[in-house]
Amino acid sequence: MSMKISEKKFNDRVGDGIQDSFMRGAVSSAQTRLYTNRLKAADELGNWEEWRELGEEIRQHTLENLDYYLMQLSENVSKRGGHVYFAKTKEEAAKYIQDVAKKKQAKKVVKSKSMVTEEISMNHALEEIGCEVLESDLGEYILQVDNDPPSHIIAPALHKNRTQIRDVFKEKLGYENSDDPYEMTKFVRKQLREKFMDAEIGVTGCNFAVANTGSLCLVTNEGNADLVMSIPKTQIAVMGMERMVPTMEELDVLVGLLCRSAVGQKLTSYVTVAGPIQEEEVDGPEEFHLVVVDNGRSQILGSEFRQVLQCIRCAACVNVCPVYRHVGGHSYGSIYSGPIGAVLTPLLGGYDDYKELPYASSLCGACTEACPVKIPLHDLLLKHRQVIVEQEGRAPLAEKLAMKMFSMGASSAALYKMGSKMAPAAMSPFTSGNRVSKGVGPLKNWTDIREFPAPSKERFRDWYKDHKKGGDK
């Protein structure tokens, strides 16, 4: 899989999402639960806004000094016996991982959940050279078996219910029991354990990399990442270049923010800090590789969108977004969905494929309020729209013509006067009472769901002319 998960046009994807009543119900229920849990976990601290400000300061400081911390991380990983590779592009990252697999003559690879490995199409790259790649995260495993893309950053199989999952297992894996979650989990555990023991390479993502220790932090609910790191002889960790913290002290703050914002817990079930195996350690890989992926991030870092790199992938913004609630994750056409996806995806994938995403927002600001590191997401969405129109020249033709006509009319007193006089008569076939009941052309999309006032028969200039200052007519 790559970052792009669908070849359908944006409007078609949205249409599919709106028609999927189960998906919308599942998303609504999950959003409500995760939102409520997040508020409770935040309230336990008593000073949530101060924690958010501290998180923002840590992320901004790290990004401002990213070159220094990346170099420090590289030096410390190397001192501990690991190998570090800086990949400028997703192709370079995938090629390096391929080369490691070829060198090890690996045929079986097991991996934990990782967005950046999806971004660089790692699974496809390994399959090209004959490797079998197994997802060990339960949600990702379900989707892999069903050849279905993820719909949520932290809950990738959110759009499926347990009956659908049972049917997938029955059809693809020969599962014969009920749709009881315990029974299905027990079945998957048996499937995965056998694969774990045979895998030559384990691949993980990285929630945070600690610069001054050369270690990585992984946060999971299932413990699968721990097995990926400890059983295979070779481990490859893949991280976006921005996923840095200076020391363990900053890590402590960000992990607390991440867990509370993502699932409403003080800590998730497993928080692991590890790296290359040391002499006194029993468990761990004999060989460790860290792949640091740029893939456009350095360009973002030097742009007006740099604040998006503060993201810690908690999905709090996704869990409060009213647009996501109604259209679902697949509508975004990217592994990154919701408000963060609408900002990040066009930067990584370009406007050619993702120019509609910045408009997939009501600009209500709920995402900005929910973000634990205070990314101004709705402002960045507006900035995208500005770039699309002013720099990219990608505004739809109808919008360009409408704006040009409005500009001509509004800048000419004679045209404006004539237009305001003719408007009531011109719009009368489309009005009912004092409201426009059916719009013309693109306006139909507005009037179908919103009330639009009809032009007044008495213009303000006429009313003003007929009234004396401070008196009546």
Curated annotation (Swiss-Prot):
The keyword Coiled coil does not apply. Keywords: 4Fe-4S, Electron transport, Iron, Iron-sulfur, Metal-binding, Repeat, Transport. Residues 302-332, 351-380 form the 4Fe-4S ferredoxin-type domain. [4Fe-4S] cluster 1 binds at C311, C314, C317, C371. One of its GO terms (molecular function) is metal ion binding. Pfam families: Fer4_8, LUD_dom, LutB_C. It comes from the Bacteria. [4Fe-4S] cluster 2 binds at C321, C364, C367. GO terms for biological process: lactate metabolic process. Belongs to the LutB/YkgF family. Is involved in L-lactate degradation and allows cells to grow with lactate as the sole carbon source. Has probably a role as an electron transporter during oxidation of L-lactate. HAMAP family: LutB. This is Lactate utilization protein B. It comes from Bacillus anthracis. The lineage of its organism: Bacteria, Bacillati, Bacillota, Bacilli, Bacillales. The gene is lutB.
